[in-house]
C-alpha cells in the first residue's frame, strides 16, 4: 500500500545520513536546525521559479522536482483550477523561524504571562526555531494557511486530490487531525518523505531527548528554557504515514 511505499522511500535515506551528500558541505548539526543560508548552497537548494510563490523562496532540488510533477499532474486532472496556485512558504532557516517565533512571543501572545502557556499558544501552529521541518527544504505550505479554505471551492479540490495522490510523488501531510499531541492540523503542509523521513531520524539521533541540551546550546529564542524540553515531542508527533 501507499504507507509502505513512503516507508521504503524514507528508509532509503536513513542509513548513513551523516556521511551522505544530502547535506552538501553543510555540517549535519547545522543542517538539521536550519543554521545555513540556502542561497549559498545552490548544489542542494534552488529558488522556486516554476510555481508561483508569495515571496522569493528556496527548496531542495530533489523535493522541488517531485512537487513540480505533482503540481503539473494536479492541474491536468483538475482543469477548473487556476494556474497560479501559490506555494505560501517553503524553506525557512533558523534565523527566519526565530523571527516568526520572537514576533509572536513579543506580539500576539505577549499578554500570556506564564512562559510555558505562552509557548504552547505559539506552538499550536508555529515551530520552535531549530525544530521546524521547514528548515530541511523538504516541506512546503501550499495555497492557504487556513484549514477552512480547504473545506470548499478551490481548496477542497486541491485537498481532495492531494490526500489521494500526493504519496505517488513522495509527499505526505505530517500534521493531520486526531494526533495525540504536537501542532494543530495543517491541511496546507506537505513534506517530501524520501528525504524528510531520514532527516527526522537524524534530528533524533543528534538532538533527541538524551541530547536536548546540545540542541538548546545551538538555538536562542524567547522562552527557550521554558518550552525547549518539548522539542522532541513536536518533531515526532506526526501523521504515522509520514514516519
Regions found by a protein language model. Give the residues of each.
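Extracytoplasmic cell-surface/polysaccharide-interacting catalytic and binding patches
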Residues: 15-243
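Bacterial N-terminal signal peptides
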Residues: 3-12
Amino acid at each position: 500500500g501507499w504507507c509502505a511505499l513512503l516507508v521504503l522511500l524514507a528508509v532509503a535515506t536513513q542509513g548513513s545520513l551523516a556521511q551522505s551528500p544530502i547535506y552538501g558541505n553543510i555540517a549535519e548539526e547545522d543542517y538539521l536546525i536550519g543554521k545555513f543560508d540556502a542561497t549559498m548552497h545552490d548544489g542542494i537548494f534552488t529558488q522556486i521559479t516554476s510555481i508561483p510563490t508569495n515571496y522569493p523562496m528556496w527548496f531542495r532540488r530533489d523535493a522541488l522536482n517531485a512537487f513540480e510533477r505533482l503540481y503539473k499532474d494536479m492541474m491536468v486532472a483538475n482543469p477548473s483550477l487556476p494556474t497560479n496556485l501559490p506555494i505560501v512558504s517553503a524553506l525557512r532557516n533558523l534565523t527566519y523561524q526565530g523571527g516568526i517565533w520572537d514576533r509572536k512571543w513579543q506580539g500576539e501572545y505577549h499578554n500570556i504571562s506564564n512562559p510555558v502557556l505562552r509557548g504552547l499558544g505559539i506552538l499550536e501552529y508555529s515551530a520552535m526555531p531549530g525544530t521546524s521541518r521547514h528548515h530541511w527544504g523538504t516541506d512546503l505550505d501550499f495555497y492557504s494557511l487556513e484549514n477552512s479554505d480547504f473545506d470548499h471551492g478551490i481548496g477542497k479540490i486541491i485537498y481532495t486530490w492531494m490526500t489521494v495522490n500526493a504519496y505517488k510523488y513522495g509527499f505526505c501531510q505530517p500534521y493531520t487531525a486526531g494526533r495525540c499531541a504536537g501542532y494543530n492540523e495543517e491541511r496546507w503542509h506537505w513534506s517530501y518523505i524520501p528525504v524528510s523521513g531520514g532527516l527526522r531520524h537524524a534530528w533524533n539521533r543528534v538532538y533527541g531527548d538524551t541530547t536536548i541540551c546540545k540542541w538548546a546550546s545551538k538555538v536562542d529564542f524567547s522562552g527557550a528554557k521554558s518550552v525547549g524540553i518539548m522539542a522532541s515531542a513536536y518533531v515526532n508527533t506526526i501523521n504515522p504515514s509520514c514516519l
